[in-house]
Amino acid sequence: EYGGSGLGYQEYVPILNEVSQVEPSHGLSVAAHNSLCMNHIYEFGNEEQRRKWLPQLASGKVIGAWGLTEHNTGSDSGGMSTTAVKDGDDWIINGAKNFITHAISGDIAVVMTRTGEKGAKNNSTAFVLEKGMAGFTSGKKENKLGMRASETAELIFDNVRVPDSHR
């Protein structure tokens, strides 16, 4: 329906395992693209978002990233510092995510943000950000010990204006 193979996780995992046996970095990149970016849009996005982004991601024309991890909180979404503040019909996103696969090479990123007080319940929202949005940049590539073929860097958000339709 959205351009994918139609395979489920029972078929996907053995394929990913085979790819990873040859080159673990490629397996990591495939998993970040498919499981983290694409799957979140598929499972939690609305139909308009699925039709807009999934065919491009499934074809490989667009590479996806997932942004949750932060410098001081790791993957604790309740303590994240990246914020999204409503401004009319848009949201303004500020903060940074680190250790993000495809932060440099990715064309879009599903990014988790805090929309309320730190630690409060129901205070996080995901947004799809596209490369080229003003204020949306990536940091330098991390010099890792292993998995070097899977690039990792920081995502930086400096007053990024995002339409509500990307939420």
Describe each PLM feature range.
Residues 1-60, 101-108:
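Internal helix-loop-helix
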Residues 6-16, 76-80, 156, 162:
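Structural signature of FAD isoalloxazine-binding scaffolds in flavoprotein oxidoreductases
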Residues 7-8, 76-78, 89, 102-107, ...:
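Short glycine/proline-enriched turns and hinge-like loops at secondary-structure junctions
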Residues 11, 131-141, 151-167:
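A glycine-rich, basic-preceded beta-loop-alpha segment at the flavin cofactor/substrate interface
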Residues 30, 94-138:
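A short core secondary-structure module
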Residues 57, 72-75, 99-102, 115-118, ...:
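Short Gly/Pro-enriched turn/cap motifs at secondary-structure boundaries
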Residues 60-68, 112:
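A short, Trp-centered hydrophobic/proline-enriched beta-strand micro-motif
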Residues 82-85:
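A structural signal for short hydrophobic beta-strand segments in well-ordered beta-sheet cores
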